[in-house]
Amino acid sequence: MKRYICVLAIIIILIIIGLHNLGVVFFDYNKVYALDGNEGIYEAMVLSKKSETDYKITYIIKLQNNLNEESANKETANKKDKNESNEIFSEKKFLLDIKKKDFEDELDYGTIIEFNGVYNKPNSKRNYGGYDYSLYLKTQSIYGTFEGTNVNVKIKNKGNFINRCIISFKTYIKSVLEANLEENEANLCIGLLIGDRTNLDEEIEEDFKTSNLTHMLAVSGSHFVYIILAMTYITKLFKRKRLGQIIMLIAIILFMNLTGNTGSVVRSGIMAILGVVASLLYRKSDMWTNMSIAILIQVIINPYIIFDIGVQLSYGGVIGIVLFNDIINDRLVKICGLFRVQKEGIRNKVIKYVYESISVTLSANIVIIPIMMLNFNTISLSFVISNLLAGSIMGVLVIYAFILVFLSIIFKTLISPLFIILNLMLKLLIFIAHICSLLPFSKIYVVTPNIVLIIAFYVIIYLFYKQVNNKEGKIRHKNILVISLIVVILINFIFPVITSKRKHLEINFIDVGQGDSTLIRVNNKNILIDGGGSSYGEKFDVGERILFPYLLDRGINKLDYVIVSHFDSDHCQGLNFVMENMKVENAIISSLGQESSEYNTFISLAQKQNTNLIFVKKGDRIKIGNSFIKVLYPGNELITDNAKNNNAIVFKFIWKNISILFTGDIEEKAENMILNLYEDNLEELEATILKVAHHGSKTSTTKAFLEAVNPKIALIGVGEDNNFGHPNSGVIERLKSIGCKIYRTDECGEITITCKNGLKIHEMLSMK
């Protein structure tokens, strides 16, 4: 009894410490965020390189001092402010962006630098259900980003000696693999051994994602199993078992540091350490205890770690294996009409491996499926096959690769021929990932599940587990079936109420950066107007990374209408991925003045997906329930100057007494033509809401056009810190002069307008 009281007391104390830390850290972040835009001269130590592009390198740094020079005659108050900001920033981790044109040399761990910097706090979610960058950085204990210039190296080779040795060894591993393997194979092997995917080929990485093998590229519990297995054989060389176990502990700690101490690595490492310590103390290791201690330690160190998706998947996988592995393995044996294999032999070992691999994979996925659906909107029905095939060589590959790396220290080029075998194994793994990515149902997109569904899923799983493990030792299949049916029926009664027919209008002006995209939901119909995209063909796919996940987060798996105002990439490019992966019933477009490769691509895609194409021009009306679309422009006369922009579809969406005018990227010439077309009936142009043309460019939104439209609300789709000077200050002044309320995606994030008993406007960046 005393033992349980002690354990309970320890748990309560640890929880109190964790809550205290959460409060301290929460206010700590807010203090730092309050200094957004702070500019100064800083001194920092480089911890590691985070990422690299063609234009800049991003480092993780630990800030040490604020070196703003102050003359002797400056006011005391200013000195106090400087000291306070120095105290707030000091000893905290930040990202430092350095443009390559300003500083070409790479910085190593332990380098003390001085730089001019502007602090930028990280963005939170910019769209509903979107990526929360600030939360991601909090899981890494990073407080934001500095834009660095005038970088000067003051001291090299500072920092922890052990860390320098580990980083040197990591660099050595990379150099050995790059020197002895083909490029793609070397980069994959680096990812498998130390979790560094920086240079991994995008197609190979995508194949691993699609085939549900990403966990192999992120160092996880399986890697520690391989390391412990290898170390077990090595420590058998020692006559003293305890000495071997101590060496194993050291190896685990070094491996944790070698792979970057990510959340999932720390979880695996702590549990592995506790297992070895239990053996040292002649105690039985308990998975639940080890897991509880691991999460408590991690939460005490960083309370935000629970929001790390890798950590959630790591713990979820372990919980699934602990709960269901033996159950599934036993059932597989019985289903196949075989008995548990006891005899040695290749055939029996293969059968045993197949059973164990399937049961481990299934049991882990039982728990993590909702996490995958919630965070990635995907499920896979072929994960068993891919993990069975890839897992068969993964363990041997990792151990063999590490052996070669260590042997190369002594024998250097003498063992180069042995790398041929490793290269072939890596080619085989790449082939398996590619083939498995092509399997049917390898990647199924699903809408983001409602919290009710997630709870129901875990309730059913819990009930299933309880039934299987009831004291009578019998599985009451009927009870499981009845309970599951009751839960499903309840959900079916609840959801019609939650998702009943939308009787009001909701306009979601989506933040897609330097582009336009609007979702309108009315009469149980989903209408998407434009899809954003890249103006210069960057690798970032707005459709895949922002728009498609956004629609799934909104619970949308089918679009009734897609409207393309014109075929500039920043309006249509994001639609391609959506069209490829979601049913689109109708596409409303204009062929007038839109001849381009983007137009041809869209037409081909629509025909391939059996999307009904509706070509419109001035005077057309499309009724959608109790709302309708009225096309105002273009007519038969086209503008040849900047044709795509100036011949964009201009239309009004009208619902009851609310109207919104969409103007694409039209410029002054098109606005003047529209004014001439409706000079005898200017009230046709009046609208409650105006989607400002061309992102607020100075070539659009003339005074005469604004006076004719007379909007109460103006929406501007514009990228944060864009290079185009959008929106133009003159446009902003003209909008203000008519008393129009202005909402910009660079300042507001997504803008949601709900039309129900008046207009209610919500800005995503203010909804924190």
Task: For each feature predicted by the language model, list its residue ranges.
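Hydrophobic alpha-helical transmembrane segments in multi-pass membrane proteins
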Residues: 8, 202-383, 400, 446-500, ...
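Juxtamembrane interface at the ends
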Residues: 28-29, 369-373, 406
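Aromatic-rich juxtamembrane segments at the membrane interface
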Residues: 139-271, 276, 366, 508, ...
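Membrane-interface helix/helix-cap signal primarily in integral membrane proteins
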Residues: 19-215, 545-552, 558, 592-594, ...
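Transmembrane alpha-helices and immediately adjacent membrane-cytoplasm interface residues
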Residues: 12-31, 491-497
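Non-globular, low-confidence helical/coil segments that flank catalytic cores
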Residues: 57, 73-81, 102-118, 136, ...
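Hydrophobic alpha-helical segments of integral membrane proteins
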Residues: 162-181, 188, 196, 204, ...
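N-terminal alpha-helical targeting/anchoring segments
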Residues: 3-11
